Amino acid sequence: GFGTGDGNPLYYKDKLTNTNGTRRSTYNIGFDLEIIPKKLILKENSALYHVDDQTDKFEKSYQQQNATSPNLTRKAEAKYIKQNQQQHSVTLTYTDTFKEKHNLEAMLGGEYFNWHQYTLNARTENSPSDDIPTLNAGSNRTYTYSYKEGYRILSGFARVNYNYNYKYLLSVVAR
């Protein structure tokens, strides 16, 4: 809870600012193409997911209730995180019936997945004024950090289904 040194919360309302925002976007597109009607079909699907996350903080000079001198450190912080993810899948499927009792379905496909993230974070202090709430005004850089990470996966797969008169089934799958 509040202590005796906390003072009036309304006093701090404009002294300690913190703004943040997140933008998320998702895009998806795909198609089905009948190369040979009802027998050979190509399917593709692609998806993109993007996130931007930004945070800005700034502490104006302020006087704590029980302190003898004001806090003049004027700390500023900025953080930015960007993420991208994409996925692409494609399959080619062949379906046919031979001599009215032999049913065959063969599928060949592949998939590509990519995810990466970029993070940037920095802090400064001792800005000369409460009117410049950005990192460039701080005379003392206290923290700087940036990092990139990511991974990719490429895979292929195949499946063959055979049945005789819809009674006996043989299925082979590979990935």
Language model regions located:
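Surface-exposed loop/turn segments flanking beta-strands in extracellular/periplasmic regions
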Residues: 1-11, 56-74, 116-144
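Outer-membrane beta-barrel transmembrane strands
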Residues: 9-57, 77-97, 105, 117-119, ...
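Flexible domain-boundary/linker segments
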Residues: 46-48, 61, 109, 125
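Histidine-centered active-site/metal-ligand motif
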Residues: 102
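Glycine-rich, aromatic-flanked loop segments that form ligand/cofactor-binding clefts
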Residues: 109-116
